[in-house]
């Protein structure tokens, strides 16, 4: 067993324009091949698009979208006696936010081709804030799975 003490968890940094940690988390998930300036450009264009379309504060739309997509429970595969069970597990808020961001970006990448990523992301965020879209569908599907496998909750 290690004699070292557990490392302090670093607080997430905030982005330069909105000064928000959530925006920075989103940028770090958009990031591909180390091109952070491109990731920032994509997100800020998406935010500008949201501002123009909804005439609301884009940060509040982003928060609402992430709050709507964040799951409370998820299922984990657990092997017991030769068979695998999908065991429902409650998740912490930070883990839930990370999942929500991942689902939002996945849903926006899967949107029909033709427009750029900023456009797709802005529309996915607006849909999620309204309560529909593929990311919301993914959350509901996860909750349904957890509800269906509630009988296996004691395997935790």
From Swiss-Prot:
GO MF annotation list: rRNA binding; structural constituent of ribosome
One Pfam short name: Ribosomal_S7
Record GO biological process: translation
Tagged with keyword RNA-binding: yes
Lineage top rank: taxon: Eukaryota
Record's keyword terms, sorted: Chloroplast, Plastid, Ribonucleoprotein, Ribosomal protein, RNA-binding, rRNA-binding
A Gene Ontology cellular-component term: small ribosomal subunit
CDD domains in UniProt: uS7_Chloroplast
Cell location: Plastid, Chloroplast
Chain's role: One of the primary rRNA binding proteins, it binds directly to 16S rRNA where it nucleates assembly of the head domain of the 30S subunit.
Quaternary data: Part of the 30S ribosomal subunit.
Similarity remark: Belongs to the universal ribosomal protein uS7 family.
Protein name as it appears in the record: Small ribosomal subunit protein uS7cz/uS7cy
């Amino acid at each position: 067993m290690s004699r070292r003490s557990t490392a302090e968890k670093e607080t997430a940094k905030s982005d330069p324009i909105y000064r928000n940690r959530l925006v920075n988390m989103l940028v770090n998930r958009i990031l591909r091949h180390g091109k952070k300036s491109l990731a920032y450009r994509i997100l800020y264009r998406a935010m500008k698009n949201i501002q123009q379309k909804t005439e609301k504060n884009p940060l509040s739309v982003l928060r609402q979208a992430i709050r709507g997509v964040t799951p409370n429970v998820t299922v984990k595969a657990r092997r017991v006696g030769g068979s695998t069970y999908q065991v429902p597990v409650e998740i912490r808020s930070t883990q839930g936010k990370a999942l929500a961001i991942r689902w939002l970006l996945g849903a926006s990448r899967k949107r029909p081709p033709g427009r750029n990523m900023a456009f797709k992301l802005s529309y996915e965020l607006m849909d999620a804030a309204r309560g529909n879209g593929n990311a919301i569908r993914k959350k509901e599907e996860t909750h349904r799975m957890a509800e269906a496998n509630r009988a296996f909750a004691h395997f935790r």
